[in-house]
Structures are given as structure tokens and as C-alpha cells.
């Protein structure tokens, strides 16, 4: 799974792209398929801004930006934001929403590996949220993110742990019982253990700074960040 990719073999899962293309028009529907992303975005944004020492005036790259929920919110914080995605329809939605909102975001359709070949060391902050589990070679994405950030810059990852609890919560619970996301959104075999992600990070110039869990309470229908990384988790790293 972690073999080196040649320049002519993009790190893309076309089935995964198709899933998100099919529902792209509803990306900004606060009650639609992406409702959970809208709900957790303030937590993500707050964590990123706090750990990075603010976003104002910084050059930020959002890898796997989709319809632009996080990218747009970081631009509102005063960052100069580029959003990368390989899905044409989500990017069209992102561009239109930014235009309607009067927000400047530069959206680009290319892989992070392609972007790294042209823009190495150009970003103060790189974010990669819930994207690693949707590509054939997540380690390649981690390497590219490390190449893109400036010395001393910050890189943030979020993904899902691979264990019985995460399968129960993220697949059975979220997709089939609570129907928070469309069925088939997640494949537990592609989930990533924190030790695996940290192992990939250790093979780059990045250094782990902080890790936190993202927790959902079905009784109160609320999300929060806190200790425990057995389901969703976020990782803050910094370039050496």
C-alpha cells in the first residue's frame, strides 16, 4: 500500500472520487450529507488556529478540500488559502460558494504530490482532514505535505483509527443507525492507526507536537475534542 508512486500513476482512488462527486451539489446543505463536517468544522478550525499560533496573514494549503468548508473558514480568519482536490464537482461547488460569499480561495484540481513538485516549502500551514483514508497510498500524502510546508511550519492531519470501536462508531453507527453520512462513505480497512501515521511522520522532516481525539455524544448530539484517539483523531506536526 505504501509503495512509491511514479509520476504517471497518480495517488487517486477513482471510486472514492466518484462517491463525493455524486453528492457534491449538497456540500453546503447544513442538513445534508455533510452536516457532520459543518458541525465539527468550528472544532477543527479552532484547534488548527490555536496550535498554529493564529492564521491571519499565513499561507495555508488545504489538502483534500472537497467543497471548501474548512478552506473557506480559514480564509475568513485572514489566511491566504489554496484548496486541493481531485474531484471536479466538489471544486466547482467550492468555487461558486466562495464567489457567493465574497471569500478569496484558490482552488486547484491536482494531487498533493503534483503540487509538492511545484510548490515545495511554500506554505506556513498545511491541513489534511479526513483525506488519508480515501487514497491508495496515504504515506505518499504525508511525505508530500512535509515537502510543502516551510521550515517551522505546521501540518495537521485528521483520520480514523482502525479497530472494532471505530468500525462500530464510524461505519455501523454513523452510516447505518444514525445515518449521519451516506452508506459506503468509509472502509474500515483503510482506517489508519495512530502508530502507523506517526511512523510515516517520523520518516519525514515533521515532528509530532500534539494529538487529540474528536468525540461524538449521541445523547446530546454534540462533538468535542479531548483525550482518547480510538475513533476520530487529529494530529499536529511541525516541520523541523
UniProtKB/Swiss-Prot annotation:
Q: Where does this protein hold S-adenosyl-L-methionine?
A: 44, 64, 85, 129
Is the Transferase keyword given for this protein? Answer: yes
Pathway listed:
Cofactor biosynthesis; ubiquinone biosynthesis
Which Enzyme Commission number(s) are listed? Answer: 2.1.1.222, 2.1.1.64
> Reaction catalysed?
a 3-demethylubiquinol + S-adenosyl-L-methionine = a ubiquinol + S-adenosyl-L-homocysteine + H(+); a 3-(all-trans-polyprenyl)benzene-1,2-diol + S-adenosyl-L-methionine = a 2-methoxy-6-(all-trans-polyprenyl)phenol + S-adenosyl-L-homocysteine + H(+)
Q: Could you cite one Gene Ontology molecular function of this protein?
A: polyprenyldihydroxybenzoate methyltransferase activity
The role this protein plays is: O-methyltransferase that catalyzes the 2 O-methylation steps in the ubiquinone biosynthetic pathway.
The record's similarity note reads: Belongs to the methyltransferase superfamily. UbiG/COQ3 family.
Please state what the protein is called. Ubiquinone biosynthesis O-methyltransferase
Amino acid at each position: 500500500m505504501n509503495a512509491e508512486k511514479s509520476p504517471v500513476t497518480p495517488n487517486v482512488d477513482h471510486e472514492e472520487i466518484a462517491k463525493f462527486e455524486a453528492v457534491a451539489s449538497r456540500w453546503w446543505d447544513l442538513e445534508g450529507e455533510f452536516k457532520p463536517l459543518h458541525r465539527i468544522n468550528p472544532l477543527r478550525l479552532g484547534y488548527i488556529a490555536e496550535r498554529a499560533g493564529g492564521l491571519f496573514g499565513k499561507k495555508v494549503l488545504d489538502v483534500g478540500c472537497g467543497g471548501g468548508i474548512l478552506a473557506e473558514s480559514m480564509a475568513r480568519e485572514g489566511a491566504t488559502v489554496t484548496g486541493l482536490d481531485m474531484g471536479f464537482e466538489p471544486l466547482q461547488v467550492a468555487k461558486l460558494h466562495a464567489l457567493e460569499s465574497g471569500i478569496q480561495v484558490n482552488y486547484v484540481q491536482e494531487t498533493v504530490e503534483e503540487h509538492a513538485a511545484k510548490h515545495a516549502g511554500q506554505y506556513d500551514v498545511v491541513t489534511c482532514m479526513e483525506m488519508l483514508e480515501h487514497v491508495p497510498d496515504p504515506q505518499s500524502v504525508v511525505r508530500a505535505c512535509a515537502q510543502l510546508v516551510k521550515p517551522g511550519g505546521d501540518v495537521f492531519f485528521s483520520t480514523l483509527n482502525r479497530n472494532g470501536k471505530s468500525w462500530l462508531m464510524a461505519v455501523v453507527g454513523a452510516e447505518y443507525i444514525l445515518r449521519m453520512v451516506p452508506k459506503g462513505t468509509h472502509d474500515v480497512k483503510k482506517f489508519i492507526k495512530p502508530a502507523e501515521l506517526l511512523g510515516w511522520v517520523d520518516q519525514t522532516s515533521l515532528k509530532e507536537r500534539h494529538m487529540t481525539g474528536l468525540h461524538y455524544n449521541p445523547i446530546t448530539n454534540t462533538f468535542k475534542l479531548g483525550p482518547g484517539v480510538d475513533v476520530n483523531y487529529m494530529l499536529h506536526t511541525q516541520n523541523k
